Amino acid sequence: MKYDFKNVERFCQDKWDFSVSKSSKQEKCYVLEMFPYPSGKIHMGHLRNYAIGDVIARYKRARGFEVLHPIGWDAFGLPAENAARDNNISPEIWTKENIDNMRAQLKSIGLSYNWNRELSTCEPNYYTHEQKFFLDFLKHGLAYRKESWVNWDPVDQTVLANEQVVDGKGWRSGAVVEKRKLSQWFLKITDFAEDLLKCLQSLKNWPEKVKTMQERWIGKSEGATIEFEVVGLNKKLKVFTTYPHTLFGASFCAVAAEHPIVQDLKNGSSVVIPVLDTGIQEIKSKRENDEKIGVYTGLNVKHPFLDKELPLYIANFVLMEYGEGAIFGCPAHDQRDFEFAQKYNLPIIPVISSAHLGVIPARDQNSYNGSQCQATQMTKEAYTGDGVMFNSEFLNGLMVSEAKEVIIKKLKEKGIGKKTTNYRLHDWGVSRQRYWGCPIPIIYCKDCGTVPVPEKDLPVILPADVEFTSGGNPLDKHPTWKFVDCPKCGKQAERETDTFDTFFESSWYFAAFCSEDKSIDKDACNRFMPVDYYIGGIEHAILHLLYSRFFCRALTKCGYFDIKEPFSTLITQGMVCHATYKDENGKWLFLAEAKELIARGTKVQVGKVEKMSKSKKNTVDPNFIIEKYGADTARLFVLSDTPPEKDMEWSDDGVEGCSRYVNKLWRMVMQLKPVNMHYDNKSVTGGLLEYRKKIHKLLHGLTDDLENCRLNCVVAKFREMTNLIAEIDVAAGKSLIDEGICILIRVIEPFMPHLAESLWQEIGGQPWPKADESLLVDDTVTIAVQINGKLRATIEVAINLPQEELKKIAIDSVSSKIDQNKVRTVYAVPNKIVNIVI
């Protein structure tokens, strides 16, 4: 007798229909996995991600919650546009075909989605709402346009947000990012920087690692803004610093290559222009973490307190995106400044005492240039610790913390500085020079300027008749779509041809799911949000999760709903990993290829276990596993051995083991039919009572595990329960077996829904089982019996047994090992231990 998983799964999937109502009086539970990009094919990471969410959703339904568990498609993006260029196919057609394929694959897994709420971000009925959001953001001062230096990806030919630049390269293309000055639309995420930072502490069910990553990205810094007078120019150079107390140790100032003062110099007639041009190109080619390099501008700035001038450099480690795009350099107490001073032979002036420098009060006694410092105690690094100030006039003798406050006060009194809070976070540039994205609803008129598209004219829909024969944005070259009458004056004007960053769509989709028509229904959003369980990869910790938190605040400000935080519990599932293989020439091999070579006696290099990836050929196709073993086996395996947040290693043997368990459970229930739903085992005694206690303890434990998303522990417990039930004698304990089976089938349902549904038809249904509390309390305890401090036996006795009785039972248990006449004394600790001294 074998379980026919194919017919069972097909039957269940055709029958299932999961709906949700905003008017239900039941407590809500919103479960959401990060929606996928429609690449056309699911991978094992998808399977694990969605299986985790489905277990939670099915469990919560069983506990009586009104569960919202939707699915959709993050459908805009560059891959569709590239596919259009490569295959001469419309991005829309390519995307919709992929969605159809992936929808069928997801349904084959048996996921309990509210399919009637399915959405796709490339549909006009979805992005019309975000165009309206943008217009409202404009009204509320949360969106603006300006010319600014942007990150330009030369391969994808589009702008990238700061968050999309990883180690100086484009997050998608891997190309070295360039700096360009373009007019861009921005969203004012900085308006919420402090709130985004503070509210991280309220996210009790988020991984600490994610909160730390966001905290560092927001990057709050307390310091001062200082104005330096530029010698020979009627200009002030503003510098933000978190170390204002080291100002007396300053030996240079430096600006970013994109700083306005650099452009002023290039527009002038200075003799240093040729040198500047060459130096700036070299600086731009070097990333922040590379060797510290710079070029002297030919300008100096006046020290705010001393009668001296500081040379002004352009340096690669100064970022326009941070602070004012300018620094003062104190090499003695900043490592980057120290390396720069060594390279360019600049003075190194300590102003904070330390153990390796000592306190030297006279300024000239401890001032070195970069080459001289090689022969001093300061040979390797700057001193960045605490200490007492010296070489600093009115700061001498003060501790660092006090010196900061004093110098900020002095700067303010002189009108050349103030206390400042700075954030690493910058406003989000949302303009992208791509076709396959949501059009930005703006019109440019020569007479009226920048004109928002009237709400009645939304959505602005992408034209279908575009050409992808050349690079760049096809919307720029469109002969008709680009041109439109101005809504104000009626004259011919031009549309904005940039589209929104695709993170715009994914920053609010969770709110769209709350209503069936994909609109933002305030009552529905307030009913279902925040998302109770949000499941996805930790790679989204900064980009998507931070933008989503911003969007909730922005939409709340605009009156759409009253939710500040989008996600209550965040589960960042680990990756699915597999061993890697190479041939003798170092070429990556699929597992099947490796096995074939090994069978022929050819040497194969077995590499380390790594995340499944197409490039390393260590992938396993979920469709193959589902076709061969069934969806329940695939689901069970990806949930079995590893906590959801940890990486899991793929194992063919593990899949086989899960398949055997599925078939074993099905056969066991079939052999024990009929199952009596009306069992009564409250009066069982002896061995049957012990079995019943164990079953209910497992039920209690796995329910607690489910509440805390310890899904691998749940699997271990219901497999143990299966073995317990199989041990019970049918003749003596059929009623207890019936009880065990009813409990077991109910608790496996979130993990193996098709199998559970099949068995349900045999035994009927029931709500989530509740453990009998009276069976969870032990009435006996195991006691260790020692002889002269060494363990010799264990005994099972009643809890709180009187000491004298406990001693007697303990002595009897080791009577064969001692001469009772030689017992000197017996120490007994109730419920714990007995020690017999002889």
UniProtKB/Swiss-Prot annotation:
EC number in record: 6.1.1.4
Top EC class of this enzyme: ligase
Main location: cytoplasm
The entry's keywords: Aminoacyl-tRNA synthetase, ATP-binding, Cytoplasm, Ligase, Nucleotide-binding, Protein biosynthesis
Binding site for ATP: K614
Motif range ('KMSKS' region): 611-615
Cellular compartments annotated: Cytoplasm
Gene3D superfamilies linked to this entry: HUPs, Isoleucyl-tRNA Synthetase, Domain 1
A single GO molecular function term of this UniProt record: aminoacyl-tRNA deacylase activity
Domain of life of the native organism: Bacteria
Motif ('HIGH' region): 36-46
Gene Ontology biological-process annotations: leucyl-tRNA aminoacylation
Pfam families hit by this protein: Anticodon_1 (PF08264), tRNA-synt_1 (PF00133), tRNA-synt_1_2 (PF13603), tRNA-synt_1g (PF09334)
InterPro entries recorded: aa-tRNA-synth_I_CS, aa-tRNA-synth_Ia, Leu-tRNA-ligase, Leu_tRNA-synth_edit, M/V/L/I-tRNA-synth_anticd-bd, Methionyl/Leucyl_tRNA_Synth, Rossmann-like_a/b/a_fold, tRNAsynth_Ia_anticodon-bd
Recorded catalytic activity of this chain's protein: tRNA(Leu) + L-leucine + ATP = L-leucyl-tRNA(Leu) + AMP + diphosphate
Gene Ontology cellular-component annotations: cytosol
Family, as annotated: Belongs to the class-I aminoacyl-tRNA synthetase family.
Protein name: Leucine--tRNA ligase
Source organism per UniProt: Wolbachia sp. subsp. Drosophila simulans (strain wRi)
